[in-house]
Amino acid sequence: DILRLWIASTDFRSEMVASDEIFKRVSDQYRRIRNTLRFLLGNINDFDHKTDAIDLNNLLELDKWILEEFKDLQKDVLEHYESYSYHLVVQRIHNFCVNQLGGVYLDIIKDRQYTTQQNSEIRRSAQTAMKLMIDQLVILVAPILSFTAEEIWQNDADLKANKASV
């Protein structure tokens, strides 16, 4: 997947350069994306979307905000895929994972996830948002990070139950 990420993150219209430094940077990008996916997956392992999901209108404002940000990500990524701008796909997904998710959202909800009761509405609100995001994020990364997407898919019982593979 790291090699695929390097290829995708390079604008194919210009010369492709390979070096140890570039592969270290790409490995770091990969690690951040993968860790974000694994964090999302780990925080929904006790969540059944059919019985535990909170209605979107009743989500906490922070959870509504991240879903709006995610909707923007989806729109941008699909446009970049359609124009074969894979380097922009990688940039957009990486920036979302690092800035909106890792830099803001996941940092804020950690207390909510770890200190509130398992079935509390505020915890389920975050889990609803995370479930909605991971279900689509795994599809967005699959063309580039196919092995990672498949790993996440196989470890999400809900996704695996609906379809055998990403």
Regions found by a protein language model. Name each.
Residues 2-166:
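Helix-rich, typically C-terminal accessory recognition domains appended to large enzymatic cores
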